[in-house]
Regions:
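Conserved beta-strand-loop surface patch within small alpha/beta domains used
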Residues: 1-72, 83-136
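Histidine-centered divalent metal-coordination motifs
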Residues: 77-81
């Protein structure tokens, strides 16, 4: 289970809307599956179909997270024209990154009047499992 305070959920949706029509991306840090910090990361591809996190911003988030005694609990990004479900590209990127212990959170802007967020785990074989989000 991933625990996300409403302010972080709202921030992910706001970030997604601000970057639309391009995908946004970011990192959620915390402890024990509870989000305590959100880092907006620049999508260097500036694309509506894929994202690539700015390496320096990713490193800065990593260092800040470690300094605060936290860990990465999730990576998030938006899907601007499709459901909040990992694409084949998302799965490939997760496997290549080696970050298989974190959640992958997707924000769907497919219907901008009814945005929604889902969280997934991706294992070493590329299997996708939806995980529950507990919103505070």
């Amino acid at each position: 289970m991933l625990r996300i305070d409403k302010r972080f959920a709202d921030e992910m949706v706001a970030h997604s809307m601000e970057e639309d029509p391009n995908e946004c991306c970011g990192i959620l840090s915390g402890t024990d599956g509870t989000v305590q910090e959100l880092y907006r990361i620049t999508n260097t591809t500036k694309s509506p179909y894929t994202y690539q996190m700015d390496p320096q911003e990713h490193l800065n988030a990593d260092l800040d997270t470690e300094r605060k005694g936290m860990e990465f609990v999730a990576f998030y990004h938006s899907h601007t024209h499709s459901p909040a479900y990992p694409s084949d590209t998302d799965v490939r990127m997760a496997l290549q990154s080696g970050y298989l212990e974190v959640h992958y959170v997707l924000v769907s802007l497919e219907n901008k009047a009814e945005t929604y967020i889902r969280a997934y785990r991706i294992d070493e074989l590329g299997n996708i499992t939806e995980d529950q989000i507990e919103a505070d």
